[in-house]
Amino acid sequence: MVFAHLDKKEYLPLAKLSALAVILLWAAAPLLLLLDIGQPLLFWHLFAYFQPESPMAWGTLILTIYPFLGSVYIWYLFRGEIQKAKVWGLIGLPIALGSHGFVGFVLSFSTARILWTTSVTPIFFLVSAALSGLALVVILDAVRYYSTLRHSPEAQARERLIFHHLGEGLYILIFADLSLILFYLMKLGLTPELFDHVLKLMTEGKLSIADLFIPLVLGLMAPLALLVAPRTARNPVSQLIASALIIFGVFFMGNLILSAAQALPLV
């Protein structure tokens, strides 16, 4: 959507498709959050008893505002009022960033969870969200490539160039994600107490090397190879496979960080 409003009109159809996907997926996100909390029927307390000093309260506010801004953006976008859509898109951009970063921000305040208490945690969740989101955009573009554009070789040729640009964004974000994972591994090696706890989890069978290396190899390194290899860099099928693997990797890597931290003893 950002490219679509930087005078790159070739991205506009993809921006419309992506914006619709955001709203549909966002409709399911609050339900998953409610299922995860211990007392879902009391979620309204976050609104009725709003505490400005609480990160959770601000996160709830952001999650509520974001779909509203997205709906207004979509309204102007599909009406062809691009300038108004651009304004609402720019207003919604920091809200979108906050909606993904606040999860890690809240976790970083959990001082009893040694794996989460770092300033890198919000950045990790933000980068992972950007990576999986861009991967979803590539999947949507692949669907468009093989459906609405299949009868137009010229349009498909132009779309392959878009695939290439999206792929460049993907592997930049993959490198960023790998760097943050490396930080977590360095923290593990440089914190004797944390290392001992993780080693105990592995010896008890609650955690294994495969839990880390499967999402790391299949979800990040394999897609990176597909995105940088000359033969596959502009191939829509390769991009589709890489994007599906990225979403798999981001999900399981995030789940690993959450579950591993909860399995460790409180400090």
Segments from the language model and where they lie:
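Juxtamembrane boundary at the C-terminal end of a transmembrane helix
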Residues: 251-267
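Membrane helical hairpin/interfacial module
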Residues: 1-62
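Long, contiguous internal "core" modules enriched in hydrophobic/ aromatic residues
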Residues: 6-15, 63-64, 69-241, 247-248
